[in-house]
Every structure is written in C-alpha cells, then in structure tokens.
Swiss-Prot record:
Subunit structure as annotated in this protein's UniProt entry: Part of the 30S ribosomal subunit. Contacts proteins S9 and S11.
Keywords: Ribonucleoprotein, Ribosomal protein, RNA-binding, rRNA-binding, tRNA-binding
Function: One of the primary rRNA binding proteins, it binds directly to 16S rRNA where it nucleates assembly of the head domain of the 30S subunit. Is located at the subunit interface close to the decoding center, probably blocks exit of the E-site tRNA.
InterPro entries: Ribosomal_uS7 (IPR000235), Ribosomal_uS7_bac/org-type (IPR005717), Ribosomal_uS7_CS (IPR020606), Ribosomal_uS7_dom (IPR023798), Ribosomal_uS7_dom_sf (IPR036823)
PANTHER family, per database record: RIBOSOMAL PROTEIN S7 (PTHR11205)
GO biological process: translation
Identification of the protein by name: Small ribosomal subunit protein uS7
GO molecular function: rRNA binding; structural constituent of ribosome; tRNA binding
Family (UniProt): Belongs to the universal ribosomal protein uS7 family.
UniProt organism field: Buchnera aphidicola subsp. Acyrthosiphon pisum (strain APS) (Acyrthosiphon pisum symbiotic bacterium)
GO CC annotation terms, alphabetical: small ribosomal subunit
Superkingdom of source: Bacteria
C-alpha cells in the first residue's frame, strides 16, 4: 500500500453570475485551451436563450436538463476466469453529474447550428424535453446495464 497521504478533492469556485458550483463545473468542461471567459459567455448566452424558450429561470432549466441526462447505472468490465463481463454498477453522484455534463457538451459540439451557444441551448432544450443525443446516450447506457443484469453478482 502506498504511504503517501490521501489528497482531497479540489474545491471548485462557484460561477460569478449565479454562484453555482454545478454551473462552474459545466463551464470548465466546456472550456477549450484555458479560455474560460469565452466558455462563460457561451454558457450564459445559451442559458438566456433557454430561459426565453421555456419560461423558466436559467439555473432551474439547466438543473432540470442535467437531471434528465444523469445516468443511474453503467457497465464496467470485469475479468472473471478467461472471459470479460460487462457488470452493471451504480454510478456515484459526482460521476453522474460529470457524465451528464460531458454528454451534453459532446452532443452540442456534434450539432450543426450557427454558434456554439445556440447549439448548447438547443441541446439543453432537448434534454429538458427528454429527447436529443445526450438523453439517447443515457438511455443506451441504461439499456446496456439492463441487458447485463445477469452479471450483477460479479460486482466488487
């Protein structure tokens, strides 16, 4: 066993506009090459567009969209004997958020719209409506876990 001390998780500073740690994490995931101010402008513009379309507050709409994309179970590879099984495991809360944010950003980048803020707002709107690529990804992960339910006893 290593004798080094256990390093705690870094505390993330809340975003300047809404004072939300969740939104700050989302901005960090969207950020490319350390250009945080550009990422902030993209996210805030997308949230403004989203709030106009849904008549909900920006942060409230974002949290609902994120909730619709969060996975509850996923599959992990586990080697038993000579074969590898896809074992369904429950996803920890921090990882749920991270996966949901990553999937939303990835699917927004794949979209074909004029600007990134428009793509992001459309993807968040689709997530609010329980449709779109990010929600499809979550459904796919859940389907995989359901299909491999028989191997759940290999959990560690």
């Amino acid at each position: 066993m290593p004798r080094r001390r256990i390093i705690g998780t870094r505390k993330i500073l809340p975003d300047p506009k809404f004072s939300s740690e969740l939104l700050a994490k989302f901005i960090n995931i969207l950020m490319i090459d350390g250009k945080k101010s550009i990422a902030e402008v993209i996210v805030y513009t997308a949230l403004k567009n989203l709030s106009k379309r849904t008549d909900k507050k920006e942060l409230e709409a974002f949290e609902i969209a994120l909730e619709n994309v969060r996975p509850t179970v996923e599959v992990k590879s586990r080697r038993v004997g000579g074969s590898t099984y896809q074992v369904p495991v429950e996803v920890r809360p921090v990882r749920r958020n991270a996966l949901a944010m990553r999937w939303i950003v990835e699917s927004a980048r794949k979209r074909v719209d004029k600007s990134m803020s428009l793509r992001l707002s459309n993807e968040l709107y689709d997530a609010l409506e329980n449709k779109g690529t990010a929600v499809k990804k979550r459904e796919e992960v859940h389907r995989m876990a359901e299909a491999n339910k028989a191997f759940a006893h290999y959990r560690w």
